[in-house]
Amino acid sequence: MKVIVDNKIPYIREAIEQIADEVIYAPGKDFTPELVQDADALIIRTRTRCDRSLLAGSKVKFIATATIGFDHIDTAYCREAGITWTNAPGCNSASVAQYIQSALFILQQTRGMKLNQMTIGIVGVGDVGSKVADVARKLGIQVMLNDL
């Protein structure tokens, strides 16, 4: 199996080289029809637009994006061409929750704010927002949610 991988994805080498026969690392902006022509799979980020102009006539059957969003993948073309794709929903949610927790502790330490007297508003209660809400509640913070 030949896989073309965006060279800016951290820690990918250890994982992919165990399962692929051939791996080529390239900057995401440098993926060309010639580069992907005989690849079986692509592992990308948002810098690589996966559409007909890149994929037509290639052997690509699988695309993985190391991102939450997938607007850089032409999903209609993939469906038409029989290409399976996946994204990484929630891949940064724990990090965001940890960052917010740290920021709240800094507010408490530098401004003397009491966490159990705070109210936090969260707009968007998907994977990230719900983890931030859980952290805030555990710290005794009143949480207000909006998910329209």
Explain the meaning of each model-derived region.
Residues 1-39:
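N-terminal glycine-/charge-rich "phosphate-binding" loop or analogous flexible N-terminal tail
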Residues 17, 79, 137:
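Anion (oxyanion) recognition and catalysis
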Residues 112-148:
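Rossmann-like dinucleotide/phosphate-binding beta-alpha-beta segment
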Residues 23, 84-85, 143:
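Hydrophobic beta-strand scaffold residues
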Residues 7-10, 27-30, 45-50, 68-70, ...:
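Short beta->alpha connector loops
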Residues 1-2, 61, 113, 117-118:
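Nucleotide donor/acceptor-binding cores
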Residues 41-112:
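Phosphate/diphosphate ligand-binding glycine-rich loop within oxidoreductases
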